[in-house]
From Swiss-Prot:
A motif ('KMSKS' region) lies at residues 239-243. Residues 353-418 form the S4 RNA-binding domain. This is Tyrosine--tRNA ligase. L-tyrosine binds at residues 42, 179, 183. It comes from Caulobacter sp. (strain K31). Belongs to the class-I aminoacyl-tRNA synthetase family. TyrS type 1 subfamily.
Amino acid sequence: MSAAASFKSEFLQTLQARGYIHQITHPDELDAAAAGGIVTAYIGFDATAPSLHVGSLIQIMMLRRLQQAGHKPIVLMGGGTTKVGDPTGKDESRKLLSDADIAANIAGIKQVFAKFLTFGDGPTDAIMVDNDVWLSKFGYVQFLRDYGVHFTVNRMLAFDSVKLRLEREQPMTFLEFNYMLMQAVDFLELNRAHGCVLQMGGSDQWGNILNGVELTRRVDHKAAFGLTTPLLATASGAKMGKTMSGAVWLNAEQLSPYDYWQFWRNTEDADVGRFLKLFTDLPLDEIARLEALPGAQINDAKKVLADEATRMAHGEDEARKARDAAEKAFEQGALSADLPTFEIAAAELKAGIVLANLFADAGLAASRGEARRLAQGGGVKVNDKAEPDANRVVTEADLVEGVVKLAAGKKKIVLVKPI
């Protein structure tokens, strides 16, 4: 469906206006279903880490938009598929996790969704389902007889996730090869148990989603639809959700609300309007006003983006604390208890530690070499004073109010605290 096409349903109108839609199967049928009643839709998330990161946020926001439009979201946790590992976009096999690791990861991920969705027993309340419930019950022969007949190896070999591995002569295990069948069965099971008619996901999941749509229509002759979002990258082409210091996690245990706020504050100028549409609930007319701010005033829009995104993920208080800490640190030069802290053994600081090493250890630079280049370019500060020599030794003599304040560029600060 073209970008100019007009939808009748509030749900698809919102997705289109805010830039979420990449591809849709059966768009007219889906639009009619969403305009005529409650649509139940799901997105699957494998439990490969104890949190999700910003790279998954567009999918979380899709479920939020679905619920805001009066429909029912299903968060499908891949307790079963995580045991296999999604080969999509991977050059090598994932490390297999134990059942205990998967359960712990699911518990961490549940905390994320509670901030974005309303869960409960109502007709449009979100529910969380684990595909291990049905996948673990299948006998191998039964699974092949019931579902293997609907998939040809010819077609499976044509999927990008498989084809790219083979072209690069990189091994793919038979375990991974089965992933697409398992994901297709997820849709069928959710359709039967919960009346789910729509699977959503990133555009890299298009093939897997098509499998589920076609399996559900072929086996049970039920309505089934698929919808994908564009793969998200910054204006400069960087992968969304990754920084020099690592992944931008959505759980406070993995990344502080302050660092989360700073991630959004550091958004490139060209991305501000797009990210406000995708990652905040601000009205479109207000977003249009913010993205039109001239010159340096665009920084005000970035602060609004950071405020709104952090409020959604961490709550109003944490968003306010993060902004206050940033303003104190960068605009007033003051210390704040809400700034990120890196703890170091008091004996190690007393003996002295090379600044480049400290920068890398504290997450202000990806490596010692990066820290040295940053210092040479004037981007390193110790206690608010520029330090061009990354080889200089930091000791307890540098303590101010019990900490050493390190800054990388204009927007990243860590307080080094001896313990």
